[in-house]
Structures are given as structure tokens and as C-alpha cells.
């Protein structure tokens, strides 16, 4: 005797299948939209797909993630948070304080994250003792990227002091190329300022940007930092305003500019253009910052989701922290692994240098969260500094005025 399923039973099975597919899916909000960034993200997508987890992409263009955070706020307010969100530093802790993030303790304990993720990163990956985010990488921000052909034509070596840097920029100008490829956006201005302040001393950087000491923020050394920004401003082109960072990288890649001050995510653009470290471009620390590293760390903050979606979320977190993925992803991204036990075998010369520099800075106490990239202080303080730095860089304030404004702006934002 044939048995037929009722319409109700068929509908129930279809709903169950749909729910199962939804549970095996992760929706990911991020701002990795440049060529090099997208190539790196594809490593994670393919890794998850191999584990049977589908990926719903939610890219929001805009370096630094400001636009992405606006979209996220709207989603969370509507009660429809993504599974995971690319996030930086204090932004993660701000969401944790709101009670919006999930708990990764189960997978973190099972895989021993506490032992392999540097303590400097854990302060942003954990809240109230609980793991809330999975760190993907460590980017260091005090890098200089130099066109090797332009450097050779200048007959110069890699500059190690401020004076040597200025001499090199003058030689680039003589070649008829733009000395500094720069994008006039507040976070890019602040990235340069970050390195300039660090070049004036580790203690000074800590006092100014981590301790927020008014004496450091308002002293003669800070005036010198702003004076140096004025000098660097004279080496950018007239069309720098609003330029995206990856377009500035392209200027160096295409021999239209001599160098760029940018974090090591810039290397991904060089690699995507088939350029080779040491042959086509040079990677070095900003003069005066050798032995020190300012960092930011891309992390995926895991938001509270329905219970049926938690297993896929935990699998995503586990995949992110696996040593094999950490190596494969960071080789493409230009960053270094967010765990200390990943060998540097597959990394190029710049990657090996980045891993070595990070380890040494971590050991020597010269590893600092980057002010410009939200790892030194909360967003309100960072944005207050951005405002003063950009106004000074664009000639709206002289150095003396900028120092006075900086002290007042930071005090008001604290």
C-alpha cells in the first residue's frame, strides 16, 4: 500500500532543511574590498566552504571601517546582527560592553588560544575574562614602502634617520616623481603622525598616546612632531585629498611616486601586482622607529546569534585560529599571524621581517597599540586626535596652535 506524505509534512521537512542550511551559513560584515584584501579574504571563504559552511558576504567599502560600523549599528538596532564582523581594537570592547557579543570560550579552551595569542592582542579579544573575538592577524603600521627603481636611481640606501629620509625625498623630487604617495583622509594623515611621534622615542609615544599625558601632548617634542608633518606635507602631490590608500600604493607600484607610509596591508597590493620584495620594492621601518612596532589587529567579533547558528560561528572561529589558515591568510594579506607558533616558512622577506620585528618588540616591551588604528585609546580620543592632525596637515593650524588644540581635544574626549 502506497503511503503519501501530507502537505503539512512536506512543508515541515522543507522548513527543517531551510533551517539547517541557514545554520550552516555565516554572514560576515567586513571592509576588505581592495584587490589584495579581497584575495586574502577568499582564503577564509574557501576554508569554510571546505568544511561545509557557506558564506554570505557583506562588504562595506571604506578604509578603516567607519562606514562598516555605521551599517553594523543599523543592523544590530534592527535586531538582525551578522554572524561575524571585522573589527579593530576598542571598537570590539565597546560592543562587548553593550552585551552584543557571543562567547567563544568553548573553542578557545579546547584549542589553547590563551597560550598562543599574544597578550597585547588578547586585551581586545577578551572581555571580562571571556573570549569574544577571533584575531586574524597582526598588522604593524610603522612601515615605509619604497619603489626600488626610484631608490636605485637616487643612488641612495634605505634611510635610517629623519635627515636621510628628507634627503631621499629631495632626490625623488629631482627625478620628477611625487616623493610621497599619500591619500588625504584623516586616518591616513594619522598613520603618518603615529610613526612620526614614535620616531621621537618609545617613552614619548607611550606618554602621549597611551597614557595621554598632557605634558607630552603639549610639549616641545609634540611641536617637533607637527613641524615634521609640515615638512612631509611639502612632498605630496596636489591631488592627494580624499585619495584611497590603495590608489596611493599604486602610485609607488607604477613608479609615479617614490614611497608610501602605510601599514603592511599595503604589501598585499604590491603582491597582487606581481611585485617582488627586494627586487621591485623595499619594506622598512619608518626612520627612527627601528626596534619598535605599532600594531593593529583585524579580528572577527562574534555577535550573539540564535542557538542553531552557534555551531557554524564556532567553526568559523576555529578555522580563523588554525595555524594553517593563519599562515595562508597572512602570506596573502601582508600581515603576520595572530599566534606565536606559526612558522615563517611560507612568508616572503617582508613577512619574515614583520614576524621577527613583532617577536622582538613583544619581548623588549616596545610593542604598542597604534593610536591611528584604534588600539591605543577608545574611538572618541582617536577621533579627537584625527581632527587636530588633519587640520594641521592641511595648513589650518600651525604647529603651536596644533599642540594647544591637541591637549584640549584629548582632554574633552577622555
From Swiss-Prot:
One Gene Ontology term, aspect cellular component: periplasmic space
Signal peptide: 1-22
Major subcellular site: periplasm
Highest taxon, organism lineage: Bacteria
Annotated function: Part of a binding-protein-dependent transport system for a sugar.
Iron recorded as keyword: no
Protein name: Probable sugar-binding periplasmic protein
Record keywords, A-Z: Periplasm, Signal, Sugar transport, Transport
Classification of source organism: Bacteria, Pseudomonadati, Pseudomonadota, Alphaproteobacteria, Hyphomicrobiales
Similarity section: Belongs to the bacterial solute-binding protein 1 family.
Positions of transmembrane segments: none
Localization, UniProt: Periplasm
Keyword Signal in record: yes
